[in-house]
Regions:
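Single, function-defining residue in the core of a domain
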Residues: 1-234
Length: 234
């Protein structure tokens, strides 16, 4: 968040948003966002184990009772044993305040945020249904605002796919270049390659890679050095 704040000060005309997963659900972070002049927006997925309450009611129960603002279809990419799928989710939102933890007497008593609750329709029919709670310092005034916050958070999946392409596809960790400058130069090339592959997942490989490159790629995947003929059948 502090690094994004530094960039935000360099481009005050642009709205930047720091996005965090459940490990970022920390009261002190929201307090910092409120107290930082010209701070970027903050969007964090809540950890359901946090015993946060609104008007003495568990916030997850409270948000589930709010009027549904609308529905949205999101794409859930493949991850491990989880298959890729599209899911329809219902969206609820409300302005609320995060109360400081009971064991924290040094922080301010509460921090205003907007909560966006996302729950999958017919979630009982899937093994891992979507149920998210997002807290954000960026105002949510209507369904379009809430939809945009959900899309911001869902964009993290694209970042994960990009990093996986860089790591597994480009094999950046296998580079043995001997110096930081060489690694940095190589990373600059591989990042562009990973970015182009990420944005062209449905294109036929011949539109991007030449026949020679495709042949070399197959040989490398098979563990044969360039120029090695394929094994002969007995």
């Amino acid at each position: 968040f502090q690094k994004v704040s530094e960039v935000q000060r360099l481009c005050p005309e642009t709205q930047l948003v720091s996005i965090g997963d459940r490990e970022s659900d920390i009261y002190d972070l929201f307090e910092l966002a409120q107290q930082t002049p010209d701070a970027p927006g903050l969007l964090v997925r809540s950890d359901k184990s946090r015993n946060r309450k609104v008007e003495q009611e568990y916030i997850w129960d409270y948000m589930a009772q709010q009027e549904k603002a609308g529905s949205l279809k999101i794409h859930i990419p493949r991850s491990g044993s989880r298959k890729a799928r599209d899911a329809w989710v219902d969206i609820h939102f409300a302005q609320t305040e995060l109360q400081r933890p009971v064991n924290n007497n040094k922080s301010i008593s509460s921090v205003p945020v907007w909560a966006v609750y996302i729950v999958e329709q017919d979630g009982q029919e899937v093994n891992d249904p979507i149920e998210w709670m997002l807290y954000t310092t960026v105002p949510v005034q209507n369904f379009d605002d809430a939809k945009k916050r959900v899309e911001w958070y869902a964009a993290r999946w694209g970042i994960e796919v990009y990093h996986r392409t860089l790591k597994s596809g480009c094999r950046i960790k296998d580079r043995q270049l001997g110096s930081a400058d060489r690694i940095e130069a190589c990373l600059g090339i591989d990042m562009v390659v990973a970015w182009r592959i990420y944005h062209r997942p449905g294109q036929w490989r011949a539109t991007v890679f030449s026949r020679q490159n495709r042949r070399r790629s197959r040989r490398r995947s098979a563990g044969r050095p360039p120029g090695t003929p394929p094994p002969a059948l007995p």
